[in-house]
């Protein structure tokens, strides 16, 4: 999840003493370089701001932004360190917890990611990203009961969630509940003409998913038709 939270630091400038203006200017330069995708320069200015005012309470945001910039440069261990520093300052900051969980997932540390998603859900019980990703982790662990609980909770919060419905269909398939998986996928595909928010690639994924269920049911001809439709949509 990409969250750059360059925010309240800049909003308080008018009420801060003159020495803090330099801190804000450094933050502003970091924002500018980030928007220009000049990430090494943005990182340099954030580090200068952190060095200038190491006790500034807004440094949680700067460390979080630094982590996101490092992640975009594939410096995953450094990004993790930055998110840890941010959470040392603001341990209940949901966006930062979600960012760290994403890094853990990219590093293959799913158990640690799961802990962060669970903490997020303790703070925000209906957080969609945390529900979706924890359900995915449970499914990888073959804890299908817990995965289903998270998918169903997600769909109560957002009944039209594409990833939630597709995830639940995949879960039903893994449990051998092929007819239920087909029902979910058929419903999503049937709304193709009505739902214009989904891209052709997203619809192609639905046809691929349905082809997988049809293959499990030994309906090879139907699976091939769906795969051809998926290729057509994604071309």
What are these regions (language model features)?
Residues 23-24, 57-61, 94-95, 128-129, ...:
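Helix-start (N-cap) detector for alpha-helical repeat units in TPR-like alpha-solenoids
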Residues 18-65, 72, 81:
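N-terminal leader/linker segments that initiate helical-solenoid repeat arrays
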């Amino acid at each position: 999840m990409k969250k750059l939270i360059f925010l309240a630091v800049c909003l308080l400038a008018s009420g801060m003493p003159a020495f803090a203006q330099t801190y804000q200017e450094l933050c502003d330069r970091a924002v500018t370089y980030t928007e220009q995708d000049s990430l090494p320069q943005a990182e340099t200015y954030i580090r200068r701001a952190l060095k200038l005012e190491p006790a500034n309470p807004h440094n949680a945001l700067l460390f979080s932004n630094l982590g996101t910039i490092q992640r975009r440069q594939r410096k995953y261990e450094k990004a993790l360190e930055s998110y840890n520093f941010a959470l040392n300052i603001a341990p209940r900051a949901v966006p930062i917890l979600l960012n760290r969980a994403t890094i853990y997932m990219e590093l293959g540390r799913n158990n640690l990611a799961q802990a962060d998603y669970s903490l997020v859900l303790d703070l925000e019980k209906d957080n969609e990203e945390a529900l979706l990703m924890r359900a995915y982790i449970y499914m990888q662990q073959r804890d299908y009961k817990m995965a289903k609980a998270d998918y169903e909770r997600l769909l109560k919060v957002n009944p039209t969630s594409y990833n939630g419905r597709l995830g639940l269909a995949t879960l039903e398939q893994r449990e051998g509940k092929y007819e239920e998986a087909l029902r979910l996928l058929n419903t999503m595909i049937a709304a193709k003409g009505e739902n214009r928010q989904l891209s052709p690639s997203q619809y192609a994924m639905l046809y691929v998913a349905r082809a997988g269920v049809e293959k499990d049911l030994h309906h090879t001809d139907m699976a091939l038709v769906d795969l051809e439709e998926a290729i057509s949509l994604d071309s």
